[in-house]
Amino acid sequence: MFETTGFLFTAETTPDVTTDLAGSVGKVEELSVVADAVNVTDSPNCKSRLNSLLVASEIRRSGLDVILQLTGRDRNQIALESVLLGALSVGVNKVLCLSGDQPDKNGPVVVNEFNSNGLIKLSKVISGGTLTDGTKIKNPLPIYPGAADDLYDQLSKPEALSKLATKIKQGA
């Protein structure tokens, strides 16, 4: 995917609230003729859905390249490291690092141990072959972290561009 010289076209899919994995994967199969990769969302709007890594893995097996969206909202360090190791083990090495949508007032409790910047750093540590506690990873593989930012409504704020620049400096 990164070898192209022009624009990359990606499509986004949100896993369904279902136990039918084939249905969630099947809805993106026709995208292979127009998209270079499929972004798989991670419980958007802070709502439970079929596990995004499972869906991403199946899409990858079908021959499409995938970008796993990963939020720090719902997981602590141990869970995030486990998800990243799992992603690498099934060939999913592109991760869009996000802080995550916040829940409604009476919604679930969020973890927020890692924001998007923290996830980018964590991805780079794991790409370097260790976990954050120094444990060596057997058969380490690279992660290609990505970042997103909402600049459209925030360009009037002086910190908007510096937030994006920080993500880029951290390796996104």
Residues covered by each model-derived region:
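Domain-level signal for soluble alpha/beta catalytic cores
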Residues: 1-172
